Every structure is written in structure tokens, then in C-alpha cells.
Amino acid sequence: MTPLFYAIIFILVLQYTVETVLDYLNAQHYNDPVPDELKDVFDVNDYKKAQAYKKTNYRFGLLTSTFSLVLTLCFLIFGGFEWVDQMVRNVTDHQIAMALLFFGIILIGNDMVTLPFSYYATFVIEEKFGFNKTTKKIFFLDKLKGWLMMALIGGGMLAAIMGFYQLTGPHFWVYAWGLVAIFTIFMNLFYSRLVVPLFNKQTPLEEGSLKSKIEAYAKNVGFELQNIFVIDGSKRSTKANAYFSGFGREKRVTLYDTLINDLEEEEIVAVLAHEVGHYKRKHIVFNLIASLLLTGLTLYILSLFVNNPEVSYAIGVSQASFHAALIGFGILYSPISEITGLILNRLSRKFEYQADDYAKATYAALPLITSLKKLSKNSLSNLTPHPAYVFVHYSHPPLYARISNLKK
């Protein structure tokens, strides 16, 4: 067992400890007095239901995170990675095939082990609180489709990156970065057209009052909008959402059918105005560029360490390899990922305020406020999160902060 092995153990335990403390602090705020501007979000019964939902998820989250830590530590300490590595070496000596088998066994194995937790969360917790609309058929089909996409896309990307590594040595990161950049831009453009239909049905928003109001707003702010779709999110959950995707002719707005059912038309337009604000303020382009730059930085740092056998030995294998080094590096690099995540979350919260301000300036504040309250009520959101939890985990400001900003 090498010093890096113990460093990995330390990182895993530290991350678990920090997350557990943050969850505990957040849970202590569940019973805090609700801010005056949010007292109309829940009635007495809904508030009790929201409290019960949060506490149930807190206890279940603690159980799953503890199980995950124990499983990972046992896998490391008792030679799980070495066992899988030797298994794939007995099947093939081709480096790329070996890596694909190695990651396939670990990822699908992990998914199978944690499947009962996912099943319980969906069919017990979400069902109990009235959110779940997923059938068992959809649940397991989603799993199978996810595995298939992981094999085709993830496996293809891994094989290509390893090919670059074998051909170019330490310069592989440049070519890998180029591949990831092309793929990321492609998915930003065509995600809704190619991936979403595998899981959901999308239909154009029908002619009527809502579509007319959306088109009138878009025209008023100079936002070219030809594609407005409704997605059948209600087949999985009662929770609502809306999102903007694509560029140019592939630009589209997608509204969940639950959103249309839960909100008034003016509130839906206000939500759309918020999404348009992200586009107009260049947040989407910024996030794309930031993601690509961080990916490039990560791949460059990986190239500096992937040839160091100690990075492979850190996960307990006896033979150094690209695939073992990837896992070792991923864990060792995770503290840096946490720091960049904090920075990006801070920027994201700032962008949310800017998008809210844009919606307020170009449409109105009141319908956005009422829509945010309804969405929070319908999802039993936490109205009094701990500031430290917000700082680490929230990509959006808490509801009370957004409403205070909109009322300025």
C-alpha cells in the first residue's frame, strides 16, 4: 500500500465527513421560521408535508452516502480493483478492450449494487409524497437505455482517448480535448433532437393563447424563437421544469407538461423570460466555454500523471495501466474539482439573479415571483437552507433571496 493509497482513503473519508456535516447543518434549519415573504408558499398541512419530505430524504441520503463510502473503502482495501483488473487481463491483453471491460464491470456493477436504493427512492419515498409517476417498466427501461448510452458514447470516447494516448503519448490530452470539445458542442446543439426522444416524447406547443403570448414576448425582446416544445415529464414525476437548449436554427424552448398544468400563462411567460435572460446575457456561451477550459485543464494535468505507475498502484492494482491511472487520478483530483465546483456555483447563482432581473425588466416581476412560489410548493422545496449548504451545493439562490431581489 503506497502513500497515494492512503491519500485516496483520506480524500474519500474527508469528502464524506464534509458532506455529512453540511447535511446535518442543513437539517438543523428545517424548523427555522419561514421568512415573511414566503409564508404564503405553504399552508399548515403542506408545510408539515414538506418538513417530513426533507427529513426523510436527509435520513435516506445519510444511509446511501454511508453505504457508498463503506463499499468504496472495502473495494479499495480488500483488492476489488485488483480483482477486476486481473479478470479483464485473463480475457484480453488488448489495452483498449481491457479498459472498456474494466470500466464496464465497475460502472454496471456499482449501478446494480445501488439499484435497490434508487428503486426505494423512486417507488417508496417519491411515491409516498405524491411525486412519482414512473412505472416499473419505465424505471428499468431507463436503466437499460442509460447503460446502452454509456457503452456507446462513454465507451467510444474512452476508446478514442486511449487511441490518442497510444499514438501521441503525453500529447494525447490535446487531441482528447478537441474530441471532447466537438462532442460537447454537438450535444449542446442536438441533445433535444437526439437524446431526449430516447426517454421522453416531445410535441410542438399547440396553437393557442399561451403560444401567442410566448411568441409576442419573444418578438418584443428580439429573441428569434421557432421551436417551442412540450415534454411529457408527467410520465415520471409531478415536478415541473423548463429549459432552453441549442443555438441558431437548433435553438428551442422545452416546457414540461407539468409546468403548463401548474402555472398560469403569464407565469409561464415569466419563466420563459428568465430562460431568455440566460441567453441574452451570454450565460450559456460562458458556461460552455468554462466547461471546455476546465476539461482541457483536467486533461492536461492527467497527462502529467497518467504515466506515473504510483497513480495506478494507489487503487491497489499490481500492474500499472491507463485505466487504473484514470480512476486513481479521478479520486486524487476530486478536491480540485470541488473547488472549481464552488466557483462555478457562485457564478451560477449570480447568473440566476441576472436572468431574474432580465425577466423583471422585459416582462414583469410579479408573475415570476408567483411562479417560483408555486414551483417550490409543488416540489416541497426547502425554504430555509443553511448558508453553508447553499454556498457549497446551490447553483440557484434560495427562494427567499430570489424574491427579495425581484422586489427591489
Where are these regions (language model features)?
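Glycine-rich, flexible loop segments associated with nucleotide phosphate handling
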Residues: 322-325
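Polar-ligand-bearing catalytic/cofactor-coordination segments
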Residues: 2-320, 335, 339-408
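Alpha-helical transmembrane segments
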Residues: 318, 328-331
